[in-house]
Amino acid sequence: MCLLFLPPELTLLVTSHLDSPKDFLGLLRASRKFYILLINELYERNVRSDGGSALLWYASRGDEVGVRNMLRAGANVNLRPPDRAQSTALLQAVTTKHTRVVQILLENGALPDAADAQSMRPLALATDGRSDTAITKLLLEYGSMANSVAFDKHTPLLRAVRSNQESKVTLLLNHRADAHILERRTGMNLLHIAASKNASLRIMKMLIDNGIPMDSQDRQGRTPLQVAVTYSSTRTVSLLLRLGANPNFKNKIQFWNGWTALFYAATKSSNSRSDNKTIIQTLVKHRAELDSKNYSEETPLLQAISRGAIKQAQVLLDCGASITPIDANGETVLHLAASSRSWCPNLMSRLVGNGADVNCAGGENGETPIFYAIRNSHDLKA
């Protein structure tokens, strides 16, 4: 007799003797009638076998019906499979950005701060990526700790600032997230991090309003403005200056001793497509000292030339930088421009045309710039 014609009671009796999950699934897929009759038995079997591991599978795929059915069958909402990841259904749903599933799990008792094997909690995952802000809101409303940290010691607020997510930063600060934490490796505070990521005006203002000093320093002695310049974050440079950042604040750490924001701008940008032209012009517009000197008596112009940042040197000259300063080695702009690292005929011509002294003796051996050029085999026709 064909199984399809058996009464439901007898079909269930037959399937109760199918110990192999493969055989049971094969029967389930044989017809729509069997699927409707046996699907709940499938959920219950999974719960009986391991507590309901299928719940994690449904959660990771955003299958609301599957999640509800597994919970109805008695699945442990906080179940962890016996693998290295030690994930939960909630962590899976947050990772895959399924807002409705997150809500269902929380409503059914999912622990909002249950961490995986790497100490990653749902709130850290929600604030690290571009997931729905509603997920962050749900987690906080269900008691997730705003200042929890993962293995990397990064808090949810740091993650939200780093990824420039205004709405999440607002939510976290409203739930008393600590705005004064530091990034462990660099000693950067949240304002430094925001500056490095070209953050929005609203984020910058929220952090400042929460008491982060405008000219606070990281482990390298840099202020948020100097960090913004370092990362060629043009928008943030302008925002910080408008909010009152000091463009002439001098770094006091040994290697960078005496550096102001203009020195960072006069260095070759980490962004190969940027020559920091707009940043330099913005700093000068906000009264940055063009001829400020660092510990080795260099000005931003001298530093730009010595480091081969020719485009930056040209911009500094456009802004009115002096060509007369001499560094601690007795070298002028022409000595440095004639060196092998920063040889540029156009720059040499411009410096000479602007009145740079071609006969000034300097450096360790008291040489004129032409000796530097000859030593480095430069074409002197320019």
Task: Name the predicted role of every residue range.
Residues M1-K33:
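N-terminal Skp1-binding subsegment of the F-box domain
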Residues E41, R68-N76, Q103-L111, K137-M145, ...:
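Ankyrin repeat domain, specifically the short helix-to-loop turn at the C-terminus of the second helix
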Residues V47-T96, R100-Q103, E107-N108:
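F-box-proximal linker/hinge
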Residues V47-W57, R80-L90, A115-A124, V149-P156, ...:
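Ankyrin-repeat boundary/"N-cap" motif
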Residues W57-D63, Q92-H98, L125-D132, R159-Q165, ...:
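Ankyrin repeat A-helix N-terminal signature
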Residues L91-M145, V149-R162:
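A generic tandem-repeat structural signature
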Residues S144-M145, A150-V169, N174-M204, D218-R222, ...:
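Solenoidal tandem-repeat scaffolds enriched in leucines and small polar residues
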Residues T267-S269, Y295-E298, L302-K311, D318-E331, ...:
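Eukaryotic tandem repeat interaction scaffolds
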